[in-house]
Amino acid sequence: TPIKSSAASDVYKRQEYHYIGAKSQHVEDWYRYPSSMDVRDFYGGDLQGVLDKMDYLEQLGVEVIYFNPLFVSPSNHKYDSQDYDHVDPHCGKIVKDGGRLLEGWETDNTHADRYILRTTDSENLEASDRLLIRVIEEAHKRGIRVILDGVFNHCGSFNKWLDRERIYENKPGYEKGAYISEDSPYHDYFSFHDNNRFLYNPTYDGWWGHDTLPKPVSYTHLRAHETRRHL
């Protein structure tokens, strides 16, 4: 049965950004069948909702809460991380908001002002991190353990280390992504087949060949020490 979600959980708006051939959208009809490619469709739900239901979960006898990745990411499954350092404000807390949505014909995410503000602003990121900490603390008070999923053999094309979408390119406080510049501090995090293609080099390795899932260099690779340290 569809539940009434908090206002924060409904923040994914239609046309907030473009991903894998279409715009993000908030699903209004819970009874429709999922599409074959619904990774950018969102049904609501956030960490505040989990926090609000913590007593109920305890009464049910829940001993463990297992989360899909909660890192910043454009997909609903979030196995294509955009920022490993922070909780996605769409699941956490959006303190600072505004900016335009993409027009129906637009596919360039450098114009996705609202999405960029929501996912790169330090106030939003830090507030979301604090909310996760509170969820964990309240769970532990009730003897409930929390497991956070994560994937590190690939990230996402939105990831700030690569920044194929150029979301971070002109944002203060962020380094240039490896897609954008050969001089990026993250250049050696990825394998490029042609280093003569900069600026904006699309020749990086992708997991199973998917360009939306760039693959950091193998942990056994000589260049991987910095990637290992960061993770």
Where are these regions (language model features)?
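A cross-domain feature marking catalytic cores of carbohydrate-active enzymes
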Residues: 69, 148-154
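N-terminal structural segment of carbohydrate-active enzymes
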Residues: 6-145, 160, 209-216
